Amino acid sequence: FLIIRRPIVLGLL
């Protein structure tokens, strides 16, 4: 879950 959430945050940045 956290692993999937990390890429999403980086993508927004």
From Swiss-Prot:
Modified residues (Leucine amide): L13
Tissue: Expressed by the venom gland.
Keywords: Amidation, Antibiotic, Antimicrobial, Fungicide, G-protein coupled receptor impairing toxin, Immunity, Innate immunity, Mast cell degranulation, Secreted, Toxin
Gene Ontology CC: extracellular region
Primary location recorded for the protein, binned into one broad class: secreted
The keyword tRNA-binding appears for this protein: no
GO BP annotations, alphabetical order: defense response to bacterium; defense response to fungus; innate immune response; killing of cells of another organism
One MF term in the entry's GO annotations: toxin activity
Disulfide bond positions: none
Location in or out of the cell: Secreted
Function in brief: Mast cell degranulating peptide. Shows antimicrobial activity against the Gram-negative bacteria E.coli ATCC 25922 (MIC=30 ug/ml), the Gram-positive bacteria S.aureus ATCC 2592 (MIC=10 ug/ml) and the fungus C.albicans ATCC 2002 (MIC=12.5 ug/ml). Has little hemolytic activity. Its mast cell degranulation activity may be related to the activation of G-protein coupled receptors in mast cells as well as interaction with other proteins located in cell endosomal membranes in the mast cells.
Similarity comment text for this entry: Belongs to the MCD family. Crabrolin subfamily.
Protein name listed in UniProt: Vespid chemotactic peptide 5g
